[in-house]
Amino acid sequence: MTVSTFNRTWAKVIVNALLRYGVKHFCIAPGSRSTPLTLEALQLQQNQQAQCHSHFDERGLGFFALGIAKVTNDPVAIIVTSGTAVANLYPAIIEASLTHHKLIVLSADRPPELIGCGANQAIPQQGIFADYPIAGVNLPKPAEHYNAGWLVATIEQACVTQSQQGGVVHINAPFAEPLYEADENAINTHPWLKPIQSWLINPQTKWINSQTIQSEVSMHENWDYWRTKRGVIVVGKLPVEQGIGIKAWAETLGWCLITDVQSCVDANLPYADIWLSNNTVHQRLLQADIVIQFGGQIVSKRVNKFLEAFKGEFWQVDEYSDYLNPFAHHQTRFVAKAHHFLRVHPPLRQKPWLLEPLALSQFCAGFIEQQVGGSLNEASLAHHIEEVLATSGNLFIGNSLFVRLVDALCKLPEGYPVYTNRGASGIDGLIATMAGVAKGSGQPTVGVIGDISALHDLNSVSLLNKISHPCILFVINNSGGAIFDMLPVEAQAKEQFYRLSHNYEFAPIATMFGIEYIRPFTWADLKAKLKLAYGRKGVTIVEIKVNDQDGSNLYKSLVKQISQAEIA
């Protein structure tokens, strides 16, 4: 068998192993060295066993794969060629690692004899992602003296680890030339495949049958005591299904419930980032005996300040064993899904122990509405974000100022899917991630990002052309990084090295990539144009042009005024 043919046979085993562990999407960047992997992934697509997606920019491709992984909860494979193509995946790998979303990187490589000798496009790729992957496999150059069962077992063991822990797997696969003109008939019939033939012909068969014994969460030995005390529940980022029941549980206990915009839990105390600025309410909330936090990645600065200041009994509930303790609490940790924790900790019905947060939250609702006003700007879009969402769809929120405005100013529908990149909270790859969420879900998706984030990920606008159902990408153009207006930095330095003000507009970008574009000036204009946008296939870019400091100034003003409100 020729080298090119055996390369394909070897790659066939790799991609078929991934199928057994739920991979349904292969995201492929162009490249020659990865040809065996690419062609075998395409064979799976031809057999209707997987979908293949392509993009010319590996950084965007990684985030596109991450978006698909977020919305499907399935592992997503990424195929790239050798060299810096691999390194361009790093930001997405970091984000996926921190949020436990499942990515499998298949990086093609030069064979070992071409590493470290000046050969073209050859860099050391083993361990290139440091400790971020939960499993790394550095395969040898394809050779018949390696048992086919060994290759299957090696790939599957990495997938087993991922299925238990989430996160990223990196499989580095060297291929020697020639890479083309394989004998298509011989790829599937080589005697080397005989030991795994029954495995190959049955896509449901796994080489490694691993059964994870799930340890059930047990009721805390002192729960009967703590459920009679004064409590606060803080809900961070959670999958939709885990948030079900938390609100009713909190109401039965009579405890204060503070929810993050990523929690998918209906807030009975919305606008916490605003009302917690009031020191009187903040101090009274600190009188709680116990705080239970579900999930992590809290957006609100003032909620985090409350958590930092609290010195009582602290419980942390999260399905992963990550160390989520930025304030070094003396804590009790439950490695459990939120709804499993609720099931074994029945509430005791009590009256609410603290009414001031509810009163101030209700006051904030009207006060925010009054202060935001009727103009179309980033603050009013954040406050009324529900009005631009599809009934059944997704919301993807970028980072920097807008996610803080949404967290502080809006009240989302119970259980509405919200996606973010808050693992490392970077601004890179946001358009690509939103495109992945839209593509993976097949549902109308609204994304909202800032202008600097959009400029940072312009290449990924081309990914929006892959979406055939109605989706909306809002670009909030405040002529620079408005989040930095919050910083106490000298004006000239802030302008030149933080805000990076510009005069760019996004209509020419939409034209270049063939994307529908609108720029509304009023809410009536926006709603009329959104009705048309939801009625056609594909993505519409909506640019909201605002004064550079309006959003940050309103945010600071709301915080200041509520902080000074007198509470009886």
Swiss-Prot record:
UniProt cross-references to CDD domains, sorted A to Z: TPP_PYR_MenD (cd07037), TPP_SHCHC_synthase (cd02009)
Biological process terms in GO annotation: menaquinone biosynthetic process
Cofactor(s) this protein cannot do without: Mg(2+); Mn(2+); thiamine diphosphate
InterPro entries: MenaQ_synth_MenD, MenD_middle, THDP-binding, Thiamin_PyroP_enz_TPP-bd_dom, TPP_enzyme_TPP-bd
Pathway assignment: Quinol/quinone metabolism; 1,4-dihydroxy-2-naphthoate biosynthesis; 1,4-dihydroxy-2-naphthoate from chorismate: step 2/7; Quinol/quinone metabolism; menaquinone biosynthesis
Catalytic activity: isochorismate + 2-oxoglutarate + H(+) = 5-enolpyruvoyl-6-hydroxy-2-succinyl-cyclohex-3-ene-1-carboxylate + CO2
GO molecular function annotations of the record: 2-succinyl-5-enolpyruvyl-6-hydroxy-3-cyclohexene-1-carboxylic-acid synthase activity; magnesium ion binding; manganese ion binding; thiamine pyrophosphate binding
Keyword Aminoacyl-tRNA synthetase: no
UniProt-listed Enzyme Commission number(s): 2.2.1.9
Free-text comment on the cofactor: Binds 1 thiamine pyrophosphate per subunit.
Top-tier EC class: transferase
UniProt entry tagged with the keyword Metal-binding: yes
Pfam families: TPP_enzyme_C (PF02775), TPP_enzyme_M_2 (PF16582), TPP_enzyme_N (PF02776)
Keywords noted in UniProt: Magnesium, Manganese, Menaquinone biosynthesis, Metal-binding, Thiamine pyrophosphate, Transferase
Recorded family membership: Belongs to the TPP enzyme family. MenD subfamily.
Function: Catalyzes the thiamine diphosphate-dependent decarboxylation of 2-oxoglutarate and the subsequent addition of the resulting succinic semialdehyde-thiamine pyrophosphate anion to isochorismate to yield 2-succinyl-5-enolpyruvyl-6-hydroxy-3-cyclohexene-1-carboxylate (SEPHCHC).
PANTHER family: 2-SUCCINYL-5-ENOLPYRUVYL-6-HYDROXY-3-CYCLOHEXENE-1-CARBOXYLATE SYNTHASE, PROTEIN PHYLLO, CHLOROPLASTIC
Subunit description: Homodimer.
Name of this chain's protein: 2-succinyl-5-enolpyruvyl-6-hydroxy-3-cyclohexene-1-carboxylate synthase
Species name: Actinobacillus pleuropneumoniae serotype 5b (strain L20)
